[in-house]
């Protein structure tokens, strides 16, 4: 990971038409290779924030720089080569007549050669277990499959930054696990992963950094453990503890004070306690 931010915001403020303030004075530096969760209650500004990262929204005040490019003067098409965005609702970005067409559309827009289109589309569809359905119409897919198709269409572009907006919505357990394991693989390969989510179990298990939004402001920027130990932040935002952390808190009455966030951490803590 380098010290140079791939995403930089300074005094980022944004108001929707009608002077509805959605973001206020957000200062962030996100570096290449981070896995960042962006959390907060509905209306806290999470999705509005990440829509500034590929130019879908432009700051009312302040600025956003993506790999050094000021989004106010950079085309969305250029920013989309850096930041891939998978929307919460897959139907907002699916419009082709076959799974293959949808997954390869962005590559064709970039005028990539036929061999590269074939290879990258195939790899992306295999990664989300949709290659066998490549000739099917997207509307014939389940919602979970359409979510995976939307993910594949962005994966095919090989952008250095991947934004996942509620990535496991509508997914069964196996599909949820598959998408998150894919995010982990991309992160391990050096991609920057930003995950907007209400699911604190995902935050606890996968994120290395958490940005907490409240009323358009980033009120906390810390590790998952630090966030889930901060009762003031949890209470003021309505965030819930992940299930394992709840169990760990219940063990405090038995003299086990360690904050654990994942099942493996909890098992290790219990084994250590039993040995003493």
Summary of predicted features, one role per range:
Residues 39-41:
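The feature captures the beta-strand-to-loop junction immediately N-terminal to the Walker
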Residues 54:
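Helix-to-loop junction immediately C-terminal to a conserved catalytic motif
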Residues 215-216:
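Conserved ABC ATPase "signature" C-loop
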Residues 115-133:
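Conserved ABC ATPase "signature" region
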Residues 162-165:
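Catalytic Walker B motif of ABC-type/P-loop ATPase nucleotide-binding domains
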Residues 62-70, 79:
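Conserved ABC transporter NBD signature motif
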Residues 137-141:
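Conserved ABC ATPase signature
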């Amino acid at each position: 990971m380098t010290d140079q931010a791939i995403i930089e915001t300074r005094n980022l403020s944004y108001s929707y038409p009608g002077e509805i303030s959605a973001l206020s004075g957000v200062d962030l530096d996100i570096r290449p290779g981070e896995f960042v969760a962006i959390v907060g209650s509905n209306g806290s500004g999470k999705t509005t924030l990440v829509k500034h990262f590929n130019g879908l929204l432009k700051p009312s005040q302040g600025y956003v720089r993506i790999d050094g490019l000021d989004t106010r003067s950079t085309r969305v098409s250029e920013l989309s080569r850096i930041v891939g965005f998978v929307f919460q609702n897959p139907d907002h970005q699916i419009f082709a007549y076959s799974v293959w067409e949808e997954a390869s559309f962005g590559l064709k827009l970039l005028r990539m050669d036929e061999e590269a289109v074939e290879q990258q589309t195939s790899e992306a569809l295999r990664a989300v277990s949709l290659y066998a359905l490549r000739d099917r119409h997207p509307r014939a897919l389940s919602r979970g499959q359409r979510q995976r198709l939307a993910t594949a269409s962005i994966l095919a572009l090989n952008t250095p930054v991947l934004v996942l907006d509620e990535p496991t919505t509508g997914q069964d357990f196996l599909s949820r696990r598959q998408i998150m394991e894919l995010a982990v693989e991309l992160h391990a390969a050096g991609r920057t992963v930003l995950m907007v989510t209400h699911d604190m179990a995902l935050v606890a298990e996968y994120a290395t950094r958490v940005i907490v939004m409240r009323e358009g402001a980033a009120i906390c920027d810390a590790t998952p453990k630090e966030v889930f130990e901060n009762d003031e932040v949890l209470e003021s935002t309505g965030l819930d503890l992940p299930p394992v952390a709840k169990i760990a808190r219940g063990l405090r009455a038995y003299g086990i004070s360690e904050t654990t966030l994942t099942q493996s951490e909890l098992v290790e803590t219990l084994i250590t306690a039993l040995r003493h």
